């Protein structure tokens, strides 16, 4: 990975349950450790983990050349509202922008919805008479006298941090910078954040929220970094402390202290970098990065060995994992979807008798019931303990001793009893005659509790599969032909099931999977993405203006990177574009070299091509807009050595087995157990099997096999299924996608998924689990329809207020499932309009691919400008 002359380096990832520490030795191999996260003082777990790993390796801290840190401190401060006392100064007339929000509602069916409160209360928001226009012109001169009055009130108000956000400052920052000058004259020690520096992008709601968030956490992060650096120096560290930012690059501690909002979502970024590295090593050009830890599961797409990036994301959601319920942050980030599906995610049965998993988590304290640290809630980890995937003898995380009894008690109380499961009616098939070879102190085969555990596992698997499908659609991608990289403590337990559900050929489980994000930190380049909104259209393109913006962004990004390294750098440029009238942009890469009139002309063609890739068709004759520009400068990373795929050999004979519930068989079966440390390149393990190591366990499902690759990565695929690219390895190791396309939404059927028919296994109550999974998948299908409509809409009410609905109906016109995104009022009109189509045309006359459309209010569309479209499938 690096020249062997380099010294050891350390990566530290603070998660919701565990703090992971990875040490890279000079030869490029890794040592690692997990310690429980200390939420009140996160540096305690960081320092304890570093001390433990260097002591075990016999390395003095002063020999370590880099310490790279990803922290949730900024995220937690925003969630828990425990940042600095902060004021917002904005343009007169725009005091309430962060409170009035947008028209979007994250829960359309909640009449008593409580919108997230603004980060800064109204009494702490001040205004200055001034106004910059959308093209940077001064519409109202900056009122110095009024500004000095605001400064005096800020000084007297006891604030420790100030956010400044004036209208259109991304085009002309003079007024914001002048206010900072006045404030520093009066209070030099007061922290100040300017929106023109933190997030120079259009859309004032998002920009103002971003600068408020930066100001709110700035004193906290600056203090934390000072304390951590001081303690590291006291321990003997002589190297710099570097931070990973949400865009997946490294930044100096000084830069992080100035722009701490860029640290939000820094941990998950490390995981995506880790997956991208594996893509290079194993010559896979398209990867699904699957990171499942103790609290959440994160899914990202890797293309051409690089993670996809976005310009905005949400944090501090009040309705966790519901889009629109949080605070928008407009800074570059690795694009991913995050759901409450971790090992510590809590399972329960709702009022409808359905198993729900997450988003609440048992966290590190008290943790899952099986940790025997006082937790009583049933979790995904407890389910894996009960069905035999996790075993006390091979669970080495942080020295925790698993209690199978506590896991069983929690599952029975939270899931089994509410569903009416009992040993007398359960039909899991405990296979009581099967014996283990050697002592087995795992969970006994209790059919009722097994049924509860299998139900929890099935639901969390389906939740993650639906999240992956949704993320792919939002990105305009089809997962056919992708591979998966699974890491995080819980991902290897669920990866086999996930690739089967998604129609993915294979999953790679790398060495160090349990601490993948921390290793990813050590693979990250110094990087910074500078962004700015600058409006240009295909009708009147300002080439010189764009050229100037790109030069300024390049200089800004290079300056930040040079704060941390003198290495050679690369530059990438991108613009967000749309059709005039739309409100959602797609990214278009810019060519290298000077931006001139020829490049401007080529930009239109590049946008049309990108739009067709996203949505299937372009729209002729419309004006195209370029709205936001970005330049990313990164240090050059060493190209890793690739490995050739290892062929499968004869499956190894198991040294030991234990009874583990097999979802395909619907019962417990003798399952081979292998210690990963004993496996060598070329070894083949046939499922059902478990491959154990200190920080995770890999499940090789029945009908699958794992082959150990040259770098000791496990490649798992269905038995006899070659990787799509192995038959034809094209030049440049681009994969040959020759296998048949699969439906991304194939539904469970009696012939296709016997495991889903039997996996709940116990009585009428547990037979509802596969029906619940099928319904969830239908919801995922129509949610994709709704999201695509929002993204392509020219109607403000559709894209901002969700003035739409999407659903699936049976032959008689009864709705089976509807999208979460949408307006309740359209549901009934949609059903009535469909009834009109059925009555007028007849179901037997309809054919797949037909399209029926009406805007007739008398056929229940509601208004002339409302349209109902139906397509038979």
Please report, for each region that a protein language model flagged, where it lies by residue.
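Glycine-rich tight-turn/loop motif centered on a GG-T
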Residues: 206-217, 261
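Conserved phosphate-binding loops in N-terminal lobes of ATP-dependent enzymes
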Residues: 11-14, 18-22, 31-45, 49-51, ...
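Conserved phosphate-binding/catalytic loops in two-lobed NTP-binding clefts
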Residues: 185-208, 503-519
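Short beta-strand segments
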Residues: 13, 87-92, 127-129, 165, ...
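C-terminal, non-catalytic interaction/recognition modules in large multi-subunit enzymes and RNPs
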Residues: 4-6, 14, 145-149, 153, ...
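Glycine-rich phosphate-binding loop of actin/hexokinase-like ATP-binding domains
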Residues: 24, 33-40, 87-93, 113-115, ...
């Amino acid at each position: 990975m690096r020249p062997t002359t380099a010294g050891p380096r350390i990566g530290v990832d603070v998660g919701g349950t565990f703090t992971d520490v990875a040490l890279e030795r000079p030869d490029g191999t890794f040592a690692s450790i997990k310690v429980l996260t200390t939420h009140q003082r996160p540096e305690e777990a960081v320092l304890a983990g570093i001390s433990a790993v260097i002591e075990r390796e016999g390395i003095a801290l002063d020999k370590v050349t880099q310490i790279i840190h990803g922290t949730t401190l900024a995220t937690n401060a925003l969630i828990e509202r425990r940042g600095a006392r902060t004021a917002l100064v904005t343009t007169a007339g725009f005091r309430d922008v962060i409170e009035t929000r947008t028209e979007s509602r994250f829960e359309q069916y909640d009449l008593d919805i409580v919108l997230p409160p603004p980060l800064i209360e109204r009494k702490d928001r001040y205004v200055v008479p001034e106004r910059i226009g959308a093209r940077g012109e001064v519409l109202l001169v900056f009122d110095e006298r009024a500004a000095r009055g605001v400064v005096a009130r800020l000084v007297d108000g006891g604030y420790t941090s100030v956010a400044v956000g004036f209208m259109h400052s991304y085009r002309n920052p003079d007024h914001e910078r002048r206010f900072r000058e006045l404030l520093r004259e009066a209070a030099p020690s007061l922290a100040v954040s300017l929106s023109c520096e933190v997030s120079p992008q259009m859309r004032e709601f998002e920009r103002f929220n971003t600068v408020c968030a930066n100001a709110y956490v700035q004193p906290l992060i600056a203090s934390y970094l000072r304390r951590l650096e001081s303690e590291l120096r006291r321990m003997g560290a002589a190297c710099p402390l570097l931070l990973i930012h949400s865009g997946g690059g490294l930044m100096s501690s000084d830069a992080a202290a100035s722009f701490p909002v860029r640290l939000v979502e820094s941990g998950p970024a490390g995981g995506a970098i880790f997956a991208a590295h594996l893509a290079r090593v194993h010559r896979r050009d398209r990867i699904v990065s699957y990171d499942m830890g103790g609290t959440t599961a994160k899914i990202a797409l890797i293309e051409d060995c690089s993670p996809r990036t976005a310009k905005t994301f949400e944090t501090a959601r009040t309705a966790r994992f519901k889009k629109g319920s949080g605070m928008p942050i407009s800074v570059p980030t690795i694009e991913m979807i995050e759901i409450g599906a971790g090992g510590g995610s809590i399972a329960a049965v709702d009022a409808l008798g359905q198993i729900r998993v997450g988003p609440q988590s048992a966290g590190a304290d008290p943790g899952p019931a099986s940790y025997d640290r006082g937790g009583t809630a049933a979790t995904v980890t407890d389910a894996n303990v009960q069905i035999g995937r996790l075993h006390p003898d091979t669970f080495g995380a942080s020295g925790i001793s698993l209690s199978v009894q506590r896991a069983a008690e929690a599952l029975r109380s939270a899931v089994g009893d509410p569903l009416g499961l009992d040993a007398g009616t359960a039909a899991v098939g405990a296979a009581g005659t099967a014996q283990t070879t050697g002592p087995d102190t795992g969970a006994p085969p209790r059919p009722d509790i097994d049924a509860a555990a299998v139900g929890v596992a099935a639901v969390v698997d389906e939740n993650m599969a639906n999240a992956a499908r949704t993320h792919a659609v939002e990105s305009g991608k089809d997962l056919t032909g992708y591979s998966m990289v699974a890491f995080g403590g819980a991902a290897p337990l669920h990866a086999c099931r996930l690739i089967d559900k998604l129609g993915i050929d294979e999953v790679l489980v790398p060495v160090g999977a349990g601490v993948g994000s921390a290793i990813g930190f050590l693979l990250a380049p110094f990087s910074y993405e500078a962004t700015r909104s600058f409006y240009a259209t295909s009708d009147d393109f300002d080439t010189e203006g764009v050229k100037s913006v790109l030069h300024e962004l390049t200089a800004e990004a290079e300056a930040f990177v040079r704060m941390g390294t003198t290495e050679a750098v690369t530059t990438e440029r991108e613009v967000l574009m749309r059709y005039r009238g739309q409100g959602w942009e797609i990214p278009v890469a810019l060519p290298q070299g000077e931006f001139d009139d020829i490049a401007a002309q080529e930009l239109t063609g590049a946008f049309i091509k990108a739009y067709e890739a996203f949505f299937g068709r372009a729209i002729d004759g419309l004006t195209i807009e370029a709205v936001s520009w970005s330049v990313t400068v990164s240090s050059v990373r060493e190209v890793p050595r690739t490995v050739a795929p290892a062929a499968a050999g004869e499956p190894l004979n198991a040294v030991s087995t234990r009874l583990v519930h097999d979802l395909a068989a619907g019962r417990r079966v003798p399952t081979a157990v292998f210690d990963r440390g004993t496996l060598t390149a070329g070894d083949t393990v046939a499922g059902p099997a478990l491959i154990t190591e200190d920080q995770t366990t890999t499940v090789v499902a029945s009908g699958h096999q794992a082959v150990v690759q040259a770098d000791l990565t496990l490649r798992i695929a269905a038995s006899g299924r070659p990787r799509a690219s192995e038959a034809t390895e094209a030049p440049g190791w681009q994969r040959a996608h020759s296998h048949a396309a699969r439906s991304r939404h194939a539904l469970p059927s009696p012939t296709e998924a016997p495991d889903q028919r039997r996996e709940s296994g116990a009585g009428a109550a547990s037979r509802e689990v596969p029906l619940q999974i099928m319904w969830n998948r239908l919801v995922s299908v129509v949610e994709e329809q709704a999201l695509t409509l929002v993204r392509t809409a020219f109607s403000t009410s559709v894209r901002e207020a969700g003035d739409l609905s999407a659903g699936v109906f049976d032959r008689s016109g009864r709705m089976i499932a509807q999208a979460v995104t949408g307006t309740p009022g359209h549901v009934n009109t949609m059903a009535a309009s469909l009834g009109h189509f059925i009555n007028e045309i007849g179901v037997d006359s309809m054919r797949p691919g037909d399209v029926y459309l009406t805007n007739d209010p008398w056929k229940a569309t509601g208004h002339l400008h409302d349209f109902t479209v139906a397509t038979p499938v």
